[in-house]
């Protein structure tokens, strides 16, 4: 089927003059357009706040207006102890957005499903950029025959999930999911040092 790509800004989605956007009534709105890294969120806190807080607020208003179902990508960084949500501007913004979504559901009958991602990797992943995740960094270094960078001792455990599995899980959650959170992960944790060793190169 035909796909039409529109270059938009979530912070201005309600006031955008694009005719297609105004007329189109989406069944689902997949909202993944946010600042999405923990460490860079300290340096780029203004961007994190602008996209994650203001942008998401406007997306919620748009979804309510269109009477669509929102599929929101939460963050696994806020799981575990309650204090985790306060560890970074990114974690805090994602946690508060989930609270806001649930409040919108109570206040305005917003239909939603939240999916939580765990260290997504795969084709077209960001490799050489401050937004790159560990798997993308490893791939970039490996392709350039450079040693892989691991902060000692490298025992941090992560659940790594391929992007194809994330896509399939997200679509399934959109169609069948209720007003709750779904963790999309492999269920297996690997040490960062062990993942680096899988590349079979210098570390």
Model-derived segments and spans:
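C-terminal substrate-binding subdomain of Rossmann-fold SDR/epimerase-dehydratase oxidoreductases
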Residues: 142-203
